[in-house]
Every structure is written in structure tokens, then in C-alpha cells.
């Protein structure tokens, strides 16, 4: 009986302990779950993420003329070549004559290819041709043909220039949003001039032996030179910019070359209208029998096309 009472008392104690300790632990679990649930953000009412900003072409890509482009120009220059007697002349008669006349409007073309982020390779070409009718002030030998003093000449010439220029952005650095850029120009140029002379009033003349007298002459002078210079462009407004450049090179008693230009450029869509002034000067080497030199200033207009504008 005593053992039965002890067993009953032990069972009652275990049950009482389970009630006092086990039930609160079970009651606390929903509270913890409720606390975890209240910390989760409500899915309703969340703002949608903002749209990605549109891609913008910066001023350094196209507005400053650095994108790939093709330009056609029309140059209204004036001036004419003149021939001088070179140091290599040993025949005792000069080779001096002023071509006279006005040049025809000169077509020109430029291809610009980006090299790196802000630099460009520019390949340009122009052609000037003209006619003149000078009268020789003295007896002369021109390209091996003898002319008399007072001879009336018909002169025709064609001058061409091809230039490859590496335009390197030198200031500012880093570029960021600068509207003003300065570039150093590293160039190589090929220049040639072909000239023909004729004395039309002496056609049909013969010498003492009855042989016809040659009264026409033809010659070509050319040279390849490096040239160095500076270029600048300024973004006046979103579609309007100013551009200028100048370069040249000379050796003492050798050939000389320089050119300069300044223009205002208005962009619309993939095109840009140009208007400005430019000048070009060259002189072939005076170490030869004869040399030719000329300076051509004038105004020009142009149309520039950016085929890849808007694709970036």
C-alpha cells in the first residue's frame, strides 16, 4: 500500500511538472512565429524600379567631330603659281615666269576615322587647277624648252595634295564634359604640281635648217613632307561648334608647306554644314633647275556625314 502511494505521488509530480513547464513552451512558439511574420515587408504597394536612363552620345564623340565621318568640300580660292630659277640651273638663262590667271573652284574630300576614344585619323585630298596667259619678261628656258623675250604663253596647271593626319587630343585630360579641346596634329603630305606651257603665236616656226621649233613644255614637281600643328574645337551649343587647325613644315633651302583653316559647323541629324576660310601654301625645292610656289587663300563650304551617329 505504501509503495502504491509512492508510485501515485511520483506520477502526479511528473504530470504537474509537465503542466507547469511543457505548456508555456508550446504557447511561446506561435508568438515567435507571429513576431517573424510581422517583420516581413508587405508585398502590396511596393514602387516599381525606375527605367534605365537613355544612352546619350557625349560631346567628345560626335559634336567635336571625332566620330567616323565623310566630308565633301567646295573651296573658292584665289591665287596662282609662279616659277623661279633654282640653284641647279646652269644654262645661264632664267626659268622665271608668273602663271597668272585664277584657279577654278577646288573640290576636296576628307575621311575621318576614330582612333581610340578621342583621337582621329584624317585622310584628306584636294585638287586645284587653272590657266594663265603670261608674257615672258626675258628669254627663258622652261622645262628644257627655250622661249624668247616677249613670248605670249598659254599655261595650264594641276596641283594636288593628299594628307594623312593623326589628330591627338592633348587637352584637357581627362576630357569629362569639356566643351573646348586642343589637339596636336601629326601629319604626312604628298604634294605635286604638273605644268604645261605653250607659245601659240609661234606655231609653225622653223629654224635655219627648216626643222620645226619646239614651243611647248611640260614638267612635274612633287615632294613628300611631314608636317606638325595644332587644332582646336569649341562646342558653342548643342548643334553648333567652332573648329580651327594649322600645320606646316619647312627645311632651309628646301621645300616648304603650310595650311590653315577655321570653320563654323552646324549639325542636324547625321549631317553637319560647314562654312569657313582656309589657306594653303607650298614651294618645291629650290635646289632643282626650277621650283614652283603658290599660296591659295579663300572661303569654303562643306557637308559632313556621320554614318554611325545614333547607333551608340
Residue ranges and their predicted role:
Residues 73-77, 126-128, 169, 187-191, ...:
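Outer-membrane beta-barrel pore domains and translocons
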Residues 66-68, 103-107, 158-162, 180, ...:
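Residues that define the transmembrane beta-barrel architecture of outer-membrane proteins
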Residues 29-124, 306-308:
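Short glycine/proline- and aromatic-enriched beta-strand/turn motifs that initiate or cap beta-hairpins
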Residues 72, 109-113, 164-168, 186-188, ...:
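Residues on the lipid-exposed face of transmembrane beta-strands in outer-membrane beta-barrel proteins
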Residues 80-105, 127-161, 192-223, 251, ...:
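Extracellular/periplasm-exposed beta-strand and loop segments of Gram-negative cell-envelope proteins
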Residues 240-255, 279:
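Transmembrane beta-strand segments that form the barrel wall of outer-membrane beta-barrel proteins
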Residues 260-312:
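Predominantly the C-terminal beta-signal and adjacent terminal strand-loop region
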Residues 58-66, 118, 171-181, 236-240, ...:
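Short loop/turn motifs that connect adjacent beta-strands in outer-membrane beta-barrel proteins
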Amino acid at each position: 500500500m505504501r509503495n502504491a502511494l509512492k508510485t501515485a505521488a511520483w506520477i502526479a509530480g511528473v504530470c504537474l511538472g509537465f503542466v507547469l513547464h511543457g505548456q508555456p513552451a508550446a504557447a511561446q512558439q506561435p508568438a515567435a512565429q507571429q513576431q517573424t511574420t510581422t517583420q516581413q515587408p508587405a508585398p502590396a504597394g511596393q514602387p516599381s524600379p525606375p527605367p534605365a536612363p537613355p544612352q546619350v552620345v557625349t560631346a567628345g564623340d560626335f559634336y567635336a567631330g571625332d566620330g567616323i565621318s565623310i566630308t565633301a568640300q567646295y573651296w573658292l580660292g584665289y591665287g596662282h603659281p609662279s616659277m623661279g630659277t633654282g640653284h641647279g640651273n646652269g644654262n645661264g638663262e632664267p626659268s622665271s615666269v608668273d602663271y597668272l590667271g585664277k584657279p577654278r573652284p577646288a573640290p576636296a574630300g576628307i575621311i575621318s576615322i576614330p582612333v581610340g576614344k578621342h583621337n582621329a585619323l584624317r585622310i584628306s585630298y584636294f585638287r586645284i587647277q587653272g590657266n594663265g596667259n603670261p608674257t615672258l619678261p626675258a628669254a627663258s628656258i622652261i622645262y628644257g624648252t627655250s622661249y624668247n623675250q616677249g613670248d605670249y604663253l598659254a599655261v595650264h596647271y594641276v596641283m594636288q595634295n593628299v594628307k594623312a593626319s593623326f589628330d591627338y587630343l592633348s587637352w584637357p585630360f581627362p576630357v569629362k564634359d569639356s566643351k573646348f579641346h586642343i589637339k596636336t596634329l601629326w601629319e604626312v603630305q604628298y604634294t605635286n604640281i604638273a605644268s604645261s606651257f605653250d607659245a601659240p603665236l609661234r606655231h609653225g616656226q622653223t629654224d635655219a635648217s627648216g626643222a620645226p621649233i619646239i614651243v611647248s613644255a611640260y614638267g612635274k614637281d612633287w615632294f613628300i613632307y611631314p608636317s606638325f600643328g595644332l587644332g582646336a574645337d569649341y562646342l558653342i551649343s548643342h548643334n553648333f561648334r567652332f573648329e580651327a587647325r594649322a600645320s606646316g613644315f619647312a627645311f632651309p633651302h628646301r621645300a616648304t608647306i603650310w595650311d590653315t583653316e577655321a570653320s563654323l559647323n552646324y549639325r542636324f541629324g547625321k549631317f553637319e554644314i560647314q562654312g569657313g576660310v582656309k589657306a594653303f601654301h607650298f614651294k618645291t625645292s629650290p635646289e632643282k633647275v626650277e621650283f614652283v610656289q603658290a599660296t591659295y587663300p579663300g572661303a569654303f563650304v562643306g557637308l559632313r556625314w556621320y554614318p554611325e551617329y545614333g547607333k551608340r
